Amino acid sequence: MKKLNEVILLLKNKKEAEEFFKDLCTPTELKALEERWAVAQLLYQNTSSYRQIAAQLKTSTTTVTRVARFLSSEPYQGYKKILKRIT
């Protein structure tokens, strides 16, 4: 993970990031990452229930619950750090 993080930090712009992640991940993996990020954003806004978020994004409540756990109680708090920067 450490080496991958170092490489990600070398990306210079959105285009490079998109190209890199399209090479690195399958379309299914990219969709899963995008889905989790969308869930995190909606949870952070705190305006919808888990079921509403799952229905809106056409994802499972399991995914919503997992992302919610990382937002609220996991030690890394990576979602929150970025969400605070962009809001």
Q: What are the functions of these language-model segments?
A:
Residues 1-12:
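General nucleic-acid-binding
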Residues 17-36:
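Short, Lys/Arg-enriched anionic-surface-contact patches
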Residues 34-48:
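Short, amphipathic alpha-helical "recognition" segments used to contact nucleic acids or chromatin
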Residues 46, 60, 71-74:
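The DNA-recognition helices of helix-turn-helix-type DNA-binding domains
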Residues 63-64:
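Helix-turn-helix DNA-binding helix
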Residues 68:
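DNA major-groove recognition helix of helix-turn-helix
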